[in-house]
């Protein structure tokens, strides 16, 4: 009898683990990844991820953070009402000359796994950036 009760308890706990709500069930982000393209060193690019509450209840963003200190997401301080879209500002420092890929995490109240989005690009030294821009032509604008 103890084995049956133990098995039933384990089974119910397993079902509960699979029934966890996911971030994708309550929010929709306009894009999973934003590519800044080429950016000028020490000119921090900014992107605004759009987060929409697709549930029927307010969504609380407990925290936002990035995979390193060179990337700064703003905090979302107010609950997101059902059907409402808010913007999450993400800024990259652009201090180091190199390609970059950085993850940004969005932790929602009541959901264990945070939602992740990503920014990518390549930082060029100022002279190299200006040369690249001239080669692209005056008609084209950088992405950032």
Residues covered by each model-derived region:
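Bacterial Sec-dependent N-terminal signal peptides
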Residues: 1-24
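Long, low-complexity ectodomains and other extracytoplasmic segments of secretory-pathway proteins
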Residues: 20-43, 50, 111-144
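Asparagine-centered strand-capping/turn motif at beta-strand->loop junctions
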Residues: 51-55
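Surface-exposed binding patches on compact interaction domains or structured appendages
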Residues: 56-84
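Beta-strand-rich extracellular modules
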Residues: 93, 107-111
């Amino acid at each position: 009898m103890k084995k049956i009760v133990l098995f039933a308890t384990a089974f119910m706990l397993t079902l509960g683990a699979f029934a966890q709500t996911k971030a994708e069930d309550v929010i929709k982000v306009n894009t999973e990844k934003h590519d800044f393209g080429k950016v000028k060193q020490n000119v921090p690019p900014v992107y605004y991820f759009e987060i929409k509450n697709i549930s029927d209840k307010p969504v609380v963003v407990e925290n936002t953070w990035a995979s390193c200190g060179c990337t700064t997401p703003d905090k979302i301080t107010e609950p997101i009402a059902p059907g409402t879209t808010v913007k999450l500002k993400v800024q990259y420092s652009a201090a180091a000359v190199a390609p970059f890929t950085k993850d940004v995490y969005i932790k929602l109240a009541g959901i264990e796994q945070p939602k992740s989005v990503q920014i990518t690009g390549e930082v060029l030294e100022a002279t190299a950036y200006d040369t690249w821009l001239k080669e692209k032509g005056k008609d084209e604008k950088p992405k950032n």
